[in-house]
């Protein structure tokens, strides 16, 4: 493969085939391409607009080069991030609830542009985010929950870290996280930062051997189920791709004020989650329940979103004990107790 020819093709706004994109991604991730050319390729892809085939090819490369673990029937609740609103880490909270009934392989990273990534909030809760594969399998067996830190499970990505940081713009790698779970989670609730990317990412997901994925983008522009209005969804299964639009009031609840969901730090997010689990923050609790409801539908545990919401109400009642179990087996209970104390007021 001639990298310069690939670059010329992208500059001419021609899409790569899946095999071309996969080969290119492997070369980049392995550090075989000079940084100046990596920068040029990432910018050219962004300016052209990443195609489905390019996303699929890059995702396959990242999956192949990742440290892998086997977690049958797992669900992930990862999103693309990048919506810029800084809401509480609802996907992480939902993952904890889901682990009461199903294996959860939560793939995530530290925040890049926001206040708190999934790694940050779990660390604030006392969780040890570096979990080697053998330990990960043990934790799944004992707790139904494991966090797979992207930087640890995709070690070759360090070869592009400097370029990405220097560029300071969204590149194709920013949207690959939810598609590259190291446990090959077959079920997923996937938040998407832009409504315009729902179609592209749903078509990409369809090519990547998921059982069922629900991609969501919610008003007022978040990569979660909307707390205030409409959520635009793509439901991807073996049967194809279905488009759905759903309003928060369809759960039988009122809209949730967005300002009540904003956080300033990982600790702030951790406190809000624990307060919701304790029944002390109704707004955040509702936000967690509506997102969990859609994830339950992705798992085929319920037949509709309203039923999922009712199930989530039961799950959140058992969330504090589950969180304690998760941290006690892989973390620092002292940190969790500190958060609990700060949440009790």
Curated annotation (Swiss-Prot):
5-phospho-alpha-D-ribose 1-diphosphate binds at residues 79, 82-83, 87, 89-92, 106-114, 118. Binds 2 magnesium ions per monomer. GO terms for molecular function: anthranilate phosphoribosyltransferase activity; magnesium ion binding. InterPro entries: Anthranilate_Pribosyl_Tfrase (IPR005940), Glycosyl_Trfase_fam3 (IPR000312), Glycosyl_Trfase_fam3_N_dom (IPR017459), Glycosyl_Trfase_fam3_N_dom_sf (IPR036320), Nuc_phospho_transferase (IPR035902). Anthranilate 1 binds at residues 79, 109. The keyword Magnesium applies. Its EC number is 2.4.2.18. GO terms for biological process: L-tryptophan biosynthetic process. It holds the Pfam family Glycos_transf_3. Mg(2+) 2 binds at residues 223-224. Pathway: Amino-acid biosynthesis; L-tryptophan biosynthesis; L-tryptophan from chorismate: step 2/5. It catalyses: N-(5-phospho-beta-D-ribosyl)anthranilate + diphosphate = 5-phospho-alpha-D-ribose 1-diphosphate + anthranilate. The keyword tRNA processing does not apply. It is an enzyme of class 2 (transferase). Its cofactor is Mg(2+). Keywords: Amino-acid biosynthesis, Aromatic amino acid biosynthesis, Glycosyltransferase, Magnesium, Metal-binding, Transferase, Tryptophan biosynthesis. Anthranilate 2 binds at residue 164. GO terms for cellular component: cytosol. Mg(2+) 1 binds at residues 91, 224. PANTHER family: ANTHRANILATE PHOSPHORIBOSYLTRANSFERASE. Belongs to the anthranilate phosphoribosyltransferase family. Catalyzes the transfer of the phosphoribosyl group of 5-phosphorylribose-1-pyrophosphate (PRPP) to anthranilate to yield N-(5'-phosphoribosyl)-anthranilate (PRA). Homodimer. This is Anthranilate phosphoribosyltransferase. It comes from Saccharolobus islandicus (strain Y.N.15.51 / Yellowstone #2).
């Amino acid at each position: 493969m001639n990298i310069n020819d690939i670059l010329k093709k992208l500059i001419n706004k021609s899409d790569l085939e899946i095999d071309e994109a996969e080969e290119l991604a492997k070369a980049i991730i392995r550090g075989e391409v000079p940084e100046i050319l990596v920068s040029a390729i990432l910018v050219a892809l962004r300016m052209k607009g990443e195609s489905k085939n390019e996303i699929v090819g890059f995702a396959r490369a990242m999956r192949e080069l990742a440290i892998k673990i086997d977690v049958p029937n797992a669900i992930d609740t990862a999103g693309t991030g990048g919506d810029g609103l800084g809401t509480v880490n609802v996907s992480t909270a939902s993952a904890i609830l889901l682990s009461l009934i199903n294996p959860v392989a939560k793939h995530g990273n530290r925040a890049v542009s926001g206040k708190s990534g999934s790694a940050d909030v779990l660390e604030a809760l006392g969780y040890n985010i570096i979990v080697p594969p053998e330990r990960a399998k043990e934790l799944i067996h004992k707790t139904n929950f494991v966090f797979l830190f992207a930087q640890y499970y995709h070690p070759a990505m360090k070869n592009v870290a400097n370029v990405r940081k220097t560029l300071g713009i969204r590149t194709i790698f920013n949207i690959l996280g939810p598609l590259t779970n190291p446990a090959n989670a077959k079920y997923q609730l996937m938040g998407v930062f832009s409504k315009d990317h729902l179609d592209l990412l749903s078509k990409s997901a369809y090519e990547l051997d998921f059982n069922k994925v629900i991609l969501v983008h919610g008003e007022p522009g978040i990569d979660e189920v909307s707390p205030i209005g409409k959520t635009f969804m793509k439901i991807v299964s073996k049967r194809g791709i279905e488009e759905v639009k759903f309003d928060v009031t369809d759960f039988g609840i009122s809209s949730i004020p967005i300002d009540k969901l904003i956080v300033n730090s990982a600790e702030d997010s951790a406190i809000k989650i624990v307060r919701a689990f304790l029944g002390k923050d109704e707004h955040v609790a509702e936000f967690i329940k509506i997102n969990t409801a859609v994830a339950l539908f992705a798992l085929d545990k319920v037949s509709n979103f309203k039923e999922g919401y009712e199930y989530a109400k039961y799950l959140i009642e058992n969330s504090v004990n589950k969180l304690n179990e998760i941290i006690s087996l892989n973390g620092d209970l002292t940190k969790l107790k500190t958060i609990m104390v700060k949440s009790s007021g």
